[in-house]
Regions:
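Electrostatic, structured charged patches in enzyme active sites and in nucleic-acid/phosphate-binding
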Residues: 1-216
Length: 216
C-alpha cells in the first residue's frame, strides 16, 4: 500500500494540506463561537409575565422590574439572596433589578465549560441590575461552600468572558459589569476576574466592594 510507506509522496501532500488547512479550520471555529456569542447576547428579553407553581411566594418589592418578586418558599441560598435584594433596594443609583430563573429558555443563561467533567453546560446568573446611568450588571450570589467550588470558578470565567464580550461588541452606549458576589463581614463584594478564587475571611485584591458600583 503506497499510503503506508514512510516516504510516500501522497502522505507528504496530505500532511502539508492538513497543516495548511489548520489555520482555516481554527478561524472557522473561532467565527462560529463569535456568532454563537452574538446570538446569545441578542436574544435575552425580560418577559412581561412568567408562570410560577405553588412552590413560589409573591413579595411586594419596589425596585424589582416585575410587579412582584417570586421566590421559592424554601431553597438553599434563600437567606443569602434575601439579604442581597434587600441591599439592592437601598441603593439610589439602581433603576431596577431582576431576579433571574434557574432553568428554561425564558431566562438568561450563559454557557460555561466544566473543567472537571470536560463538558459544556449552562448556568443562570442570579441577578440583572439596571443602573440609572444605563449600566447593566449581571451578578451571581454565592455563600459558603458554593463560593469555593470548582464549578463557581468555571462559571466566574464564563461570566467574565461574557461581560468582556458585551463591552467590546458595538455597545459603546451601554456599559456592562458583573461577577460573583459574596458577603464578607456584613458587606457585599464582587469578583469580576477571569482567575476567580475565594477564601473565607481573606479576600484577595480581585474582590471589590459593591459600594463602588453605587457611588454614582
Amino acid at each position: 500500500d503506497i499510503m503506508k510507506r514512510a516516504n510516500s509522496i501522497f502522505r507528504g501532500c496530505i500532511t502539508l494540506a492538513l497543516k495548511d488547512y489548520r489555520p482555516i479550520l481554527n478561524q472557522q471555529i473561532k467565527q462560529r463561537k463569535e456568532e454563537s456569542k452574538k446570538r446569545e447576547s441578542e436574544t435575552f428579553i425580560i418577559q412581561p409575565s412568567y408562570s410560577y407553581t405553588e412552590d413560589y411566594e409573591a413579595l411586594e418589592i419596589n425596585k424589582c422590574i416585575l410587579d412582584k418578586l417570586y421566590l421559592r418558599k424554601q431553597y438553599n441560598g434563600k437567606e443569602n439572596e434575601t439579604k442581597f435584594y434587600n441591599y439592592l433596594e437601598q441603593q439610589e443609583s439602581i433603576e431596577w433589578w431582576y431576579k433571574n430563573g434557574d432553568q428554561g429558555k425564558d431566562y438568561l443563561s450563559i454557557k460555561y465549560f466544566k473543567s472537571q467533567e470536560k463538558t459544556e453546560d449552562s448556568f443562570y446568573p442570579d441577578w440583572i441590575i439596571k443602573f440609572k446611568d444605563g449600566t447593566i450588571g449581571v451578578f451571581d450570589t454565592k455563600a459558603g461552600i458554593t463560593a469555593t467550588s470548582n464549578e463557581t470558578v468555571d462559571k466566574a470565567k464564563a461570566l467574565h468572558e461574557r461581560i468582556d464580550y458585551l463591552n467590546s461588541f458595538n455597545r459603546s452606549e451601554i456599559r456592562y459589569v458583573g461577577g460573583i458576589v459574596v458577603m464578607e463581614g456584613e458587606q457585599w463584594f464582587y469578583n469580576d476576574s477571569i482567575g476567580y478564587s475565594y477564601m473565607n475571611g481573606k479576600l484577595s485584591e480581585d474582590w471589590k466592594s459593591m459600594k463602588t458600583l453605587f457611588l454614582k
